[in-house]
From Swiss-Prot:
Location relative to the cell: Cell inner membrane
Protein name: Nopaline permease ATP-binding protein P
Annotated Gene Ontology cellular component terms: plasma membrane
Annotated Gene3D superfamilies: P-loop containing nucleotide triphosphate hydrolases
Disulfide bridge partners, by residue number: none
Alphabetical UniProt keywords: ATP-binding, Cell inner membrane, Cell membrane, Membrane, Nucleotide-binding, Plasmid, Transport
CDD domains assigned: ABC_HisP_GlnQ
GO molecular function, one term: ABC-type amino acid transporter activity
InterPro entries: AAA+_ATPase, ABC_ATPase_HisP-typ, ABC_transporter-like_ATP-bd, ABC_transporter-like_CS, MetN_ABC_transporter-like, P-loop_NTPase
Tagged with keyword Cell inner membrane: yes
Positions with a binding annotation for ATP: 40-47
Membrane topology, as annotated: Peripheral membrane protein
């Protein structure tokens, strides 16, 4: 990937569910090493926007670019993509590691098997190489000692760390986190945020939908505040948290900080 080229671009993204307009033409650019946090009230469109970036939700309009691959979205009356190469979308998805709030691990596989699955069967990489790298990523997230366990034997925080290792194993250009701590007991939140902070320090490109304001303030290079499907405020953490210009953003922050 060209070092001068943005890692991820979402431009003028619109999304409707029936007659309800969820996203009203919002844009984001993440350059290499950026950590972009998306904050806002529940129902503001944060997760929908994130899911549109890798086509888990199909935008009704917009442009998504990952490295040198891009899709300019056109849809029919039913909201289905038209004139788009599905293989291009698959190539884009492989460059975006996704971490969900609900872990989404395969319950019938061990921790190690979960992390190896994508590189083995999607990337078709050699098993020995995949296993070694999977153990390295499990070690990175502090859970290599649980490689033979099954997800049901782990705490929520441990399961989420496995899902982060699984995303890393695909060696993506960027990581997308959809409220990665919201399903966790409060005492387990810290262990997951510690891993994500470590990834930020390594220079990984990340887009994080989060309710953890301290994390967004301390780790982000850029913060977006969404309100009713629009970007109401954006800037550096200092600009957004210390000197927001939007009354709605000020009200939101005063209620959560």
């Amino acid at each position: 990937m060209d070092a001068t080229q943005p890692t991820l671009v979402a431009e003028d993204v619109h999304k409707n569910f029936g007659t309800l307009e969820i996203l009203k033409g919002i844009s984001l650019t993440a350059n290499k090493g950026d950590v972009v946090s998306i904050i806002g009230s529940s129902g503001s469109g944060k997760s929908t926007f994130l899911r549109c970036m890798n086509f888990l939700e199909t935008p009704n309009k917009g442009r998504i670019a990952v490295g040198q691959e891009e899709v300019v979205v056109k849809t029919d009356a039913a909201g289905r993509l038209i004139g788009v190469d599905r293989k291009k979308i698959e190539r884009m998805r492989m460059q975006l590691g996704m971490v969900f709030q609900s872990f989404n691990l395969w319950g019938h596989m061990t921790v190690l098997q979960n992390v190896m699955e994508g590189p083995l069967h999607v990337l078709k990489q050699p098993k020995g190489e995949v296993r070694d790298r999977a153990m390295d990523f499990l070690d990175k997230v502090g859970i290599a000692n649980k490689h033979a366990a099954y997800p049901s034997q782990l705490s929520g925080g441990q399961q989420q760390r496995v899902s982060i290792a699984r995303a890393l194993a695909m060696q993506p250009s960027a990581l997308l986190f959809d409220e990665p701590t919201s399903a966790l007991d409060p005492e387990l939140v810290g262990e997951v945020l510690k891993v994500i902070r470590k990834l930020a320090e390594e220079g990984r490109t990340m887009v994080v939908v989060t309710h953890e304001m301290g994390f967004a303030r301390d780790v982000s290079s850029k913060v977006l505040f969404l309100e009713k499907g629009q970007i109401e405020e954006q800037g550096t953490p200092q600009e957004v948290f210390q000197n927001p210009t939007s009354p709605r953003c000020r009200a939101f922050l005063s209620s959560v900080l």
